[in-house]
Amino acid sequence: FTLTNSDVLE
């Protein structure tokens, strides 16, 4: 599982 800045944009 990876969390990126783009994922957090939601």
Curated annotation (Swiss-Prot):
Domain of life: Eukaryota
UniProt name for this protein: Unknown protein 2
Taxonomic source organism: Pseudotsuga menziesii
